[in-house]
């Protein structure tokens, strides 16, 4: 990338980096660390035309979420404004956008792909 004087780095984090989760302090810390790492590198490499961003998925239909208890899964979905779990394509489409020329002026950012869950998260705990 340095040799080519351009490039894109896209790191994958998690909604848990922003919200925390019971029993997942280590996971939340590691994902939050990726965000700080990415922002620091984005500042360092911006003038070298290397863009560094994060994608922060929420609950996406995967083998991992298939193992979630159905009652808990219904509760999670009720907290997502879009009313559904995301698909892998939702995340990959965001990554494709960040890898494309359409995102040349975007660096040091985290894009949330979670059906609005992060946006609405705090208000659910108040109600």
Where are these regions (language model features)?
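Residue(s) in the substrate-gating loop at a strand-loop-helix junction
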Residues: 14
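Short, flexible catalytic-loop segment of classical short-chain dehydrogenase/reductase
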Residues: 18, 35, 53-67
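Short C-terminal tail/terminal secondary-structure segment
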Residues: 19, 96, 107-127
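Active-site "substrate specificity/gating" loop of NAD(P)-dependent dehydrogenases
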Residues: 20-24, 46, 122
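Active-site helix of classical SDR
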Residues: 30, 38
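Alpha-helical segment proximal to the catalytic Tyr-Lys
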Residues: 43-47, 104
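A glycine/serine/threonine-rich, flexible loop-to-helix segment
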Residues: 47, 59-80, 120-127
